[in-house]
Amino acid sequence: MKPAIMKPVRAKKPRTRPVDREGREQAALMEEIALRYPDVFEMIYHVPNGGHRHKKVAEKLKHQGVKAGIPDLVLPMARGGYFGMYIEFKATVDPAPVSPSQQACIRRLNDQGYLAIVCRGHFDAMEQLRAYLLLPKTEVAA
């Protein structure tokens, strides 16, 4: 019988927790909107499509209508001839690329009369929102 060969045990490096920069920046944006534009804060909402989910949960949500590519933030306030504003939010540091499904969705929304844009970070999104809010209200013909 051969003697057992003992291999040295290597200590595993502790894994660093992933940092959700996009989520943090978007939360900061929502805080600023709440402070500066309370009426807008009441209307704007986040579409929780992203994130990693268990396969069964993702399948269930897909059957309930979750679609890939829908922008992160929706503001259903009509301005400047647009019916509303959609923002695909990306972090300023290590931003994820705009996916083909996001590009296609943004194009479809723009074709339907919405202002759908990609914003890189909290400050970019705030500037775009300010510019949108300065546009005259879209009047609906009765």
What are these model-derived regions, one by one?
Residues 1-142:
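Catalytic phosphate/metal-binding cores of nucleic-acid and nucleotide-processing enzymes, i.e., regions
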